[in-house]
Amino acid sequence: MVQAQAAAKEAAAAAIPLMAPYKMGRFELSHRVVLAPLTRCRSYDHVPQPHAALYYSQRATNGGLLISEATGVSATGEGYPEIPGVWTRQQVKAWKPIVDAVHRKGALFFCQLAHVGRASTNDQQPNGQAPISSTDKQITPDDSHTVYSKPRRLRTDEIPHVVDDFRVAARNAIEAGFDGVEIHGAHGYLIDQFMKDSANGRTDQYGGSLENRCRFAVEVIDAVVAEVGADRVGIRLSPYIDFMDCFDSNPEALGSYMVRQLNKHPELLYCHMVEPRMATVEGRRKINHGLLPFRKQFNGTFIASGGYDREEGNKVVDDGYADLVAYGRLFLANPDLPRRFELNAPLNKYDGSTFYTHDPVVGYTDYPFLEEKKEDSATVIV
């Protein structure tokens, strides 16, 4: 009986690559579908709330991998209302029951450590001070018309203190029970602001050459690895993305350099990269698969993200383009996404208007599971 079940599982994995098990360092995963880090703005006063335990545990499966929403490493690292942190004892204590709820479902949980840098406003900063950054250049408003405050360029002697904030936050995350941490080096936030030449503009050892611009990122990685161990550390990078008015003139060189730095830590767990922006071909959105050079270079687990659906996810895993695929909006709207992918079942549509609202239920924990939809349909038929 057990052998038959195992054979059936292997057959399913062969037919659906996303459902194949995977060994990620010390961790055994039962499938390749990862919850991407998603800002949800429901951690009041930057303290994780009890409703987050339900939200994350809904999306947890035995042997699945969840990555938390961006979690601030310090008071200066916050840029939006109701974003969680992990720099105070109160925050660490509040995370513990949330992590426990995920672990009870048998899932792994990584905490994404973030500092927004200049993507903030004075009213989100301690004592109304200016946001800190690699630069004093203000973000140019985009289509969202969000206006960020003019930042203050960090002095060279201040940078080690920010590096240490990441180190302490990593230690706090492990104390809260997380299985590991993901360093947020993507999407135009502080680490990205140092790395990309459009936003750096420094003339000290943290600016100018590619090596200098990546120095802050490398120092953060080294500090976090030294604190919690490389086998508990991943990083998210987006060399091609121009979010937050932050872009690089040579993203290929940037991504390649950073991967080489990651490889200096042989046990570093994973590299999570975001695809270039999508193109529209014959009315359909198409992923520009631009991560292959980095995947070939990196020695550890490679996670791809950026608009994937079931078909594309299966393809990139089957082709060896990625080991795991992170899903954001689809996982937000479908708490049982791995099961839906396994069954090729219809998906709930997400409601973008509730992504960043503060309601603890609506648009957060009220998306139906597949069984609930079936029951609803049966009720209608009767």
Curated annotation (Swiss-Prot):
Spell out the Polar residues composition-biased ranges.
120-138
**Its EC number(s):** 1.3.1.-
Ordered alphabetically, the record's keywords are: Fatty acid biosynthesis, Fatty acid metabolism, Flavoprotein, FMN, Lipid biosynthesis, Lipid metabolism, NADP, Oxidoreductase, Oxylipin biosynthesis
- Name of the protein this chain belongs to: Putative 12-oxophytodienoate reductase 3
* Role noted for this protein: Putative oxophytodienoate reductase that may be involved in the biosynthesis or metabolism of oxylipin signaling molecules.
Positions with a binding annotation for substrate = H184, G185, A186, H187, R277
Kindly list the positions annotated as binding FMN: P37, L38, T39, A70, Q112, R236, G307, G328, R329
Q: Into which family does the record put it?
A: Belongs to the NADH:flavin oxidoreductase/NADH oxidase family.
Give the source species. Answer: Oryza sativa subsp. japonica (Rice)
List the active site.
Answer: Y189
List the molecular function annotations (GO) for this entry: FMN binding; oxidoreductase activity
Please give the Pfam families that the UniProt record associates with this protein: Oxidored_FMN (PF00724)
Query: Where in this protein does the record put region Disordered?
Result: 120-147
